[in-house]
């Protein structure tokens, strides 16, 4: 009666999904897809193929499905590299989120993106040892998620991990 809530207009539903079955459901049921799965064009296109299967199953037009990619970006200064302390501070928290996600979903270091396989293998061994006796491992694994890099994880925030898991580059390169 007072119209505090709009119940007449359709509200789009965005579905957050990073795993293949969930991405298919996002395409089937959602009006939009939200992911943090990848920072490469190829990876995003691969992930989109899973979403598209759900879109097709629902008989929808894929051009009407919005796509949202959560990531972090860090613009490199002139002559600045991926190993600078400023870059590690800004991009590191997101880079460790990628390691956390790989640890939970990929398990096999050989299945990780090629540039970070050696670092991920070390990270996996580190976390296997750290979490072996914890029932609530996910609290420890995801501590600092997107906010800060834990001291003990700083060794894994390498230029390769930053370059592979974040949108960190010179401004012109990010425009591409």
Model feature map: region roles:
Residues 13-16, 33-35, 65-72:
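Hydrophobic faces of well-ordered beta-strands that scaffold small-molecule active sites
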Residues 25-34:
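Glycine-enriched alpha-helix->loop->beta-strand junction motifs that scaffold or abut catalytic
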Residues 16-25, 167-175:
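Short, acidic/polar
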Residues 38-41:
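Short, acidic/turn-prone active-site loops that include or flank metal/cofactor-
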Residues 6-12, 30-31, 60-65:
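Short, well-ordered coil/turn segments that N-cap beta-strands
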Residues 1-4, 44-175:
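An alpha-helical appendage that flanks or caps ligand/catalytic pockets
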